[in-house]
């Protein structure tokens, strides 16, 4: 397709006056499973569910961004919920089996990754586990292609993981 664009510029007589930029995002990583941090939050009393598995209340909730997850507190000023959530997520990260390679506080995420939002924490994947929003069932699940976050490859990871971006620029003003 790049050749088609360049040919079209030549045919139109504008090739010598055109600047070309070829850029890419940082790509996708292959995954082998999905993990559900909300299942652990529920197990540890930070998400309350009824007998039918419906959420009745919550103090912390993970919102998936595929290979990362943003963790929100219902009341960001609730120090007890903050400490309990941070301790649980940190223990899961240290265990090395829950698909979490890093737990960022909101301040660390902003300072180190320039990521800012209403979240209290950000989870980064181990590179082969995608995060789910589910709070029911088992923590670890096999791949499920019914949701784009849980296919054989996905996005949402730190830019220094996986394939690196491409930037090629050429033309008369470059």
What spans do the regions from the language model cover?
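Charged catalytic carboxylate motif
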Residues: 1
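Low-complexity, glycine/alanine/valine/leucine- and proline-rich hydrophobic stretches
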Residues: 135-174
């Amino acid at each position: 397709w790049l050749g088609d664009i360049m040919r079209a510029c030549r045919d139109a007589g504008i090739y010598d006056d055109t600047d070309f930029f070829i850029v890419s995002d940082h790509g996708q990583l292959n995954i082998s499973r999905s993990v559900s941090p909300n299942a652990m939050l529920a197990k540890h009393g930070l998400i309350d569910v009824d007998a039918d598995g419906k959420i009745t209340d919550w103090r912390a909730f993970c919102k998936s961004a595929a290979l990362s997850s943003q963790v929100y507190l219902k009341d960001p000023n609730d120090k007890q919920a903050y400490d309990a959530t941070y301790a649980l997520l940190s223990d899961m990260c240290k265990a090395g089996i829950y698909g979490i390679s890093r737990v960022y506080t909101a301040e660390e995420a902003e300072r180190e990754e320039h990521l800012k939002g209403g979240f209290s924490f950000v989870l980064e994947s181990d590179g082969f586990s995608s995060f789910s929003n589910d709070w029911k069932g088992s923590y670890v699940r096999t791949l499920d292609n019914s949701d784009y976050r849980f296919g054989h490859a996905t996005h949402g990871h730190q830019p220094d993981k996986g394939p690196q971006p491409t930037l090629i620029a050429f033309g008369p003003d470059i």
